[in-house]
C-alpha cells in the first residue's frame, strides 16, 4: 500500500524497514543482496548514495517519499499493490520513471495494480484494463472502457 503522504518514522532507516519487511515475508534474499538491490534501485531513482541510512520519510521531499515507495514495491514484489496518488509530489522526469516502473510491475505475471490518481498523463501512459469509479457513498461501478477515465478527467463527475 502506498499513501498520498507517507508518514515519517524517526529512528527507523529506509533500509531497516526493507530488511524487517523482507524478514517477515521470509524471503531467502541475503542481507548483502538486499542492500545491494536497495542501493541499485535508489540510484536508478536518483536518490543519494546514503539513502539506505536516512530515517524513513524524515525530512524527505514528497518526491523522495514516492521514490521510496517504488523501492518498496520493487523489493517486496507483492501480488497486489494499492497506490494512492503515486504521482503526487513528483516532477515530470520522476513521473516518467514512476510510470515505467509501474508498467513493468503491472506487466508481470499475476500482478494487480490499483491506482488512485487524478493525473491524466499517468492514466494515459499506464493504459489500465479497467476503471472503477466510486461515488460519495462509496458505491462503485467498474468500466472496461478506459474512455470513462478521460471523460471524468475532462468533464468531472456527473450525477
Located regions from the model:
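Helical segment within the ABC ATPase nucleotide-binding domain
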Residues: 95-108
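Conserved beta-strand-loop-alpha-helix hinge in the C-terminal portion
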Residues: 130, 134-159
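Q-loop/switch helix immediately C-terminal to the Walker
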Residues: 4-5, 11-25, 37
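ABC ATPase C-loop
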Residues: 73-74
Amino acid at each position: 500500500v502506498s499513501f498520498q503522504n507517507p508518514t515519517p518514522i524517526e529512528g527507523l532507516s529506509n533500509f531497516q524497514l526493507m530488511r524487517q519487511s523482507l524478514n517477515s515475508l521470509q524471503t531467502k534474499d541475503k542481507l548483502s543482496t538486499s542492500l545491494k538491490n536497495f542501493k541499485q534501485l535508489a540510484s536508478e531513482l536518483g536518490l543519494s548514495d546514503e539513502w539506505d541510512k536516512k530515517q524513513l520519510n524524515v525530512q524527505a521531499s514528497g518526491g523522495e517519499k514516492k521514490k521510496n515507495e517504488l523501492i518498496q514495491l520493487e523489493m517486496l514484489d507483492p501480488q497486489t499493490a494499492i497506490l494512492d496518488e503515486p504521482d503526487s509530489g513528483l516532477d515530470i522526469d520522476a513521473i516518467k520513471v514512476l510510470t515505467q516502473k509501474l508498467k513493468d510491475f503491472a506487466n508481470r505475471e499475476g500482478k494487480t495494480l490499483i491506482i488512485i490518481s487524478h493525473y491524466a498523463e499517468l492514466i494515459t501512459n499506464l493504459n489500465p484494463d479497467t476503471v472503477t469509479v466510486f461515488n460519495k457513498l462509496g458505491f462503485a461501478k467498474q468500466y472496461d472502457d478506459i474512455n470513462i477515465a478521460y471523460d471524468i478527467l475532462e468533464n468531472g463527475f456527473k450525477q
